[in-house]
Design a protein with these regions (language model features):
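Active-site microenvironments in enzyme catalytic cores
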Residues: 2-11, 25-28, 34-114
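Well-ordered beta-strand scaffold positions
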Residues: 21-22
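Short beta-strand-centered aromatic/proline hotspots
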Residues: 14-17
Length: 114
């Protein structure tokens, strides 16, 4: 059993449950609503009809509201500083650098990327 977000030729993006090779849609607005309802409750509300894997397009399971990306992971920072003959500044450990990026740039399996 796997949770997914899918679309079909007839319906736009909707949460679903994949059981073996069948896809059962869920009566929720999105995957965040499924999580809020609880996995067990959501799973008990699957559609009676099911679709084959070939009948759906899979998308990013959860569309993030915001998205952060880290400047670099520790080993990269250590190596880069060592190559310059310096130690990693203590501030890097206290205030790791990150930035906000575009949450609309998240795509799912086989999505067409513009």
């Amino acid at each position: 059993m796997k949770f997914a977000t899918v679309s079909t030729l007839r319906a736009s993006s909707q949460p679903a449950l994949v059981i073996e090779d069948r896809v059962h849609t869920l009566p929720y607005a999105d995957m965040k609503a499924v999580i809020a309802a609880g996995a067990a409750k959501a799973a008990s509300r699957t559609s009676k009809e099911s679709l084959s894997l070939e009948e759906v397009n899979f998308h990013s399971p959860i569309h993030p509201t915001t998205l952060r990306d880290a400047y670099a992971f520790e080993q990269h920072v250590v190596t880069a500083n060592r190559n310059r003959g310096r130690e990693v500044p203590e501030e890097w450990y206290q205030f790791p650098v990150f930035y906000f990026t575009n949450p609309n740039a998240v795509f799912g399996h086989e999505d067409v990327i513009p």
